[in-house]
Amino acid sequence: MPILGHSIPLAALGTFILWLGWFGFNARSTTAANKDIAMIFVNTNLAAAAGAVLAMFTSWTKFGKPGASMTFNGALAGLVAITSPCATVSPLSAVIIGAIAGVIVVFSVIFFDRIRVDDPVGAISVHGVNGAWGTLAAGIFNMGGTSAKIIGVQILGIVSCFVWTFVTAFIMFKLIDMTIGLRVSPEEEAEGLDFSEHGGNAYPDFGVSAYAQQ
């Protein structure tokens, strides 16, 4: 049984806080105050907007309704995807990159749910899958021109990051699982960690246990 988020308005607020912060995140990477910053601002905003719109329409087509949470993930997917190429692509390319990210995130979330990966907020799809897409897009849409060598280097970077992250994360999580334990019990998960770990329930009217007792 899925455990849904308790507040769509708070999720929307969090998305817009991240969206605003991303302007500083991407523009700061130039390490200098020059005209490139304006282009980075534009590309960042366009990619996020395109990601949100395409994720909304994709989820609408797939599920019959334009899901709010998937739309938020689409905006974040666009932001993640444009991070690598933010200073080296045109505004039109930024729209294309963000739009593709919005479509990717929907199908990626569906895929990881189908193979039973516990990712309640779609972090793998937003940051992992679309991080890889953005890295590849930096080579494909480069304003200075692209080549097989450039794309090959980008793919090598993607594979290197995946191998390093997978191996180190697997070792870390395995050690945690063998010592203090990696997951809580199904009962604690259903009841809510606010209660099981802190002795209080932040949202007593929205927990599974509140309805089970009625």
How would you name each of these model-derived features?
Residues 1-214:
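Hydrophobic alpha-helical transmembrane bundles of multi-pass membrane proteins
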